[in-house]
Amino acid sequence: MKLKVFNVREEEATLAQDWANRNHVELSMSEGPLTLETVNEVEGFDGIANAQIEPLDDAIYPLLKEMGIKQIAQRSAGVDMYNLELAKQHGIIISNVPSYSPESIAEFTVTIALNLIRKVELIRANVREQNFSWTLPIRGRVLGNMTVAIIGTGRIGLATAKIFKGFGCRVIGYDIYHNPMADGILEYVNSVEEAVEEADLVSLHMPPTAENTHLFNLDMFKQFKKGAILMNMARGALVETKDLLEALDQGLLEGAGIDTYEFEGPYIPKNCQGQDISDKDFLRLINHPKVIYTPHAAYYTDEAVKNLVEGALNACVEVIETGTTTTKVN
């Protein structure tokens, strides 16, 4: 069996090769993405493992079909970069890795939240200037006295809720589907609006859909409890960035922890030191004094990277050997 792996980082290559040696599978790995220019590299292979970031060109699906490719295994939980229906029409199964390490993202969410609540960034900036005074701008709050709203109560949302509850927070949640595992951890409310009106901190853990794109806009921020904090460790498209910046500037929100930006594709995960960034909204976001921005790194732990690499490769084998996989999304 021969598999083609795209968008491979050095650390992933080592894990992938270890997996290949154990499973007696031949791998060809490429640092670059799957594009119209690179799709011919798939010729002669049985399957594809990918870490697509930008939307996959629709013209690629029929080309893969001609090559006999029946699946693409995405190394992430999100699959919004694929045209799932078009892939299905061409007999191509798209799979994901739905649960690679919910705890990694949950722990990171709470870490950044605590940094915002206790003004750690401002304290560190003062210390670098040898300002050791105690002043009102660095005075924080007790996390355990806060109400936290979890929007999206799947694996990651629930893992996040558990940690906040461990600090003593009242945790409320909203999801179209109620998670039976959430009993005793959070209280469900009837709408997103109800959740944000009550919460001191709102944490997003929902997948992107046509219905929730830019759900968190200025109108929504005006319904937030004054001085609340927004955490987005889910998908950038959930938040209208211009409106978030305006809400922060107006004092509607106290701060924001942002790990995903809607138009991050040209920059993440790349070293852009010394380069001009043309996206002015992105520049405003990453430099805003009330924002802690991180480059889609909430998931990034040893456990998560290993599970993503092996989960995608296992899905490749499963489809090739059985015709389907338990992680199929289309």
UniProtKB/Swiss-Prot annotation:
Keywords: NAD, Oxidoreductase
Pfam families, per the entry: 2-Hacid_dh (PF00389), 2-Hacid_dh_C (PF02826)
Transmembrane residue ranges: none
EC number: 1.1.1.28
Gene3D superfamilies: NAD(P)-binding Rossmann-like Domain
Active-site residues, record numbering mapped to chain: R235, E264, H296 (proton donor)
Binding site for NAD(+): R155, I156, D175, M206, P207, N212, M233, A234, R235, D259
Official protein name in the record: D-lactate dehydrogenase
Organism from which the protein derives: Streptococcus agalactiae serotype V (strain ATCC BAA-611 / 2603 V/R)
Gene that this sequence comes from: ldhD
